[in-house]
Amino acid sequence: MGSQKVIRVVIDTNVIISALLFGGIPGQLIPLWKSGHIKPLASAEIIDEYIRVMTYPKFKLIEEEIHYLLHFEILPYFIVVSVGPPLSPIIQKDPSDDMFLLCAEAGKANFIISGDQHLLSLKNYKQIKILNPEQFVKSL
């Protein structure tokens, strides 16, 4: 990699699920994190959310598939960041999205990659850019 700086990112649940299960533009993130070009960050709360969403019946994943995705596609490449609780809600309309902002701040992320309008409408948070997957891939 030479002098190229690794890009630290927080990936919202909707994007991680799309990347792992459906490919498309979000799927372009997988080789980036596997090659070390980007370094995804996640808190325990975010990982719990990834698992919770993977268990949704609409995805038809069995326990072994969820285990595989978590232990072979996510955890080996992600840095787990310790995050404290927010002092007050940051996103009033959907405080559950605060976990992505708090993780990005604690982990000194460069970007949050999301498809969530509550996050995207912020555009940035404490100098951390918030982009959808297409915007992020085009920015590289």
Task: List each language-model region with its residue ranges.
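Helix-adjacent hinge/juxtasegments
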Residues: 53, 58-84, 88
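PIN/NYN-family metal-dependent endoribonuclease catalytic core
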Residues: 11, 27-57
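Acidic, PIN/NYN-like endoribonuclease modules and their adjacent C-terminal/linker elements
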Residues: 107-113, 117-140
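Metal-dependent nucleic-acid phosphoesterase active-site entry motif
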Residues: 1-27
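A short secondary-structure junction motif
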Residues: 16-23, 44-66
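A secondary-structure boundary/capping signal
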Residues: 12-13, 42-43, 115-116, 132
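Active-site neighborhoods of divalent-metal-dependent phosphate/nucleic-acid chemistry enzymes
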Residues: 77-111, 117
